[in-house]
């Protein structure tokens, strides 16, 4: 196992390397290879002007090398020259159970509660088709993860958006009265909860989840709880699994997880659900079996096993320290040096969500013009409109600290 991280004064001495600037060009990386390439995938940043390198801050993956136990595990399996049919191993399930016990103090999780999903959105799609019909409304919070919007559109369902609201301290909060009203008025029986929330970065407290789940219980709503960001926690915040809130929450929730956000494995595809209720589990299995979609890749299985080893815990702890440093720097700089930009300090994820309405109106700019200014100097940030904020910009800060400071130097000198 890797050595322990030590802290000397305010300088972090880390076992793992989060400072090397990794060249991902030509290595199957949408975040860099798609820029300026005319790729039809959402709205892609344009190439920067001459003299500026690209700092990828749009696609939600990381610009760090993953924990070494993952490639080691993949290579060990790949060296055996047969890749035929197989079943998930005991080690796969035991790794998941152990990870949730050690990270989130989950007890009572058994192999029968775990099911493979070919991506978190694949799970969401299966659940939507299993428990709703085309034309039905589904409750979500806005700002909203763009992937949810696409799944609902592609399956013929309708998003009923309950806006998150900022309190007097600028913290995003659920509006419980609004949620309850929308559910009742639209006869909604399925809700999607993003915990931690993307793009706003909220790590919901137990009390907040208790209030939300009480509303879902009152209205007999099944809940899809997307907890893919649950390992990415900033500044000491703690994730509360939705299913841990109560026995009722445990039985009405389809929770979905993956090592992909935590360990930068999105290209390998491999998520899993946790379902305790037999009725929900059977309906999900039936819908999934109809498409033959959820077939696990053997290398994805071994990637998860490698990720969820002991070294993975330390790697994630160090990652969260580095991401906290990045987030704190960016948040403080915006608050102190850039007028007219609203930003809430994320508690989880590595995304920063900017609201730029005041700035744009004060400077007679459209949001598209502001975004293009960033792209022109290599700050490849992302439009916020697909997340239901027409004045929004989403920034991925999972890059080395030196690139975070470089990005904001460019923003200060050339953009804002």
PLM region descriptions:
Residues 3-13:
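Short, Lys/Arg-enriched N-terminal segments with co-localized hydrophobic residues
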Residues 15-119, 126, 310:
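N-terminal small-domain helix-loop-helix segment of the aminotransferase-like
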Residues 323-324, 328, 337-376, 393:
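Conserved PLP-binding catalytic core of the aspartate aminotransferase-like
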Residues 252-336, 342-346:
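PLP-dependent aminotransferase class I/II
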Residues 362-416:
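PLP-dependent enzyme catalytic core of the Aspartate aminotransferase-like
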């Amino acid at each position: 196992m890797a050595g322990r991280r030590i802290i000397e004064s305010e300088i972090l001495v880390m076992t793992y390397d989060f400072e090397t600037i990794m060249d991902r060009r030509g290595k199957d990386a949408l975040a860099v290879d798609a820029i300026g390439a005319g790729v039809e995938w959402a709205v892609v940043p344009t190439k920067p002007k001459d003299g500026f390198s690209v700092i990828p801050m749009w696609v939600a993956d990381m610009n760090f090398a993953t924990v070494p136990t993952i490639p080691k595990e993949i290579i060990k399996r790949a060296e055996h020259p047969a890749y035929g049919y197989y079943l998930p191993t005991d080690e796969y399930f035991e790794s998941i159970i152990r990870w949730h016990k050690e990270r989130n103090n989950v007890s009572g999780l058994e192999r029968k509660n775990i099911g493979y999903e070919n991506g978190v959105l694949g799970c969401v799609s299966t659940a939507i088709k299993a428990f709703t019909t085309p034309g039905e409304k589904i409750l979500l919070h806005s700002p909203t993860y763009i992937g949810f919007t696409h799944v609902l559109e592609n399956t013929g369902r309708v998003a009923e958006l309950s806006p998150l609201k900022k309190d007097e301290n600028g913290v995003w909060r659920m509006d419980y009265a609004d949620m309850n009203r929308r559910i009742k008025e639209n006869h909604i029986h399925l809700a999607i909860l993003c915990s931690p929330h993307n793009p706003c970065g909220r790590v919901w407290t137990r009390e907040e989840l208790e209030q939300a789940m009480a509303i879902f219980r009152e209205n007999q709503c099944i809940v899809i709880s997307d907890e893919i960001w649950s390992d990415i926690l900033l500044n000491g915040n703690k994730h509360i699994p939705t299913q841990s809130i109560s026995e009722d929450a445990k039985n009405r929730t389809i929770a979905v997880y993956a090592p992909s956000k935590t360990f930068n494995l999105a290209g390998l595809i491999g998520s899993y659900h946790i379902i305790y209720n037999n009725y929900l589990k059977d309906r999900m299995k039936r819908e999934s079996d109809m498409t033959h979609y959820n077939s696990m890749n053997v290398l994805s299985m071994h990637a998860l096993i490698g990720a969820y080893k002991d070294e993975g815990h330390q790697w994630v702890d160090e990652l969260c320290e580095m991401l906290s440093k990045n987030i704190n720097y960016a948040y403080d700089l915006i608050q102190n040096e850039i007028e007219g930009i609203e930003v809430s300090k994320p508690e989880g994820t590595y995304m920063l969500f900017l609201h730029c309405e005041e700035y744009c109106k004060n400077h007679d700019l459209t949001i598209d013009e502001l975004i293009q200014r960033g792209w022109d100097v290599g700050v490849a940030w992302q439009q916020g409109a697909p997340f239901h904020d027409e004045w929004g910009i989403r920034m991925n800060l999972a890059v080395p600290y030196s690139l975070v400071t470089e990005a904001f130097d460019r923003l200060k000198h050339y953009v804002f």
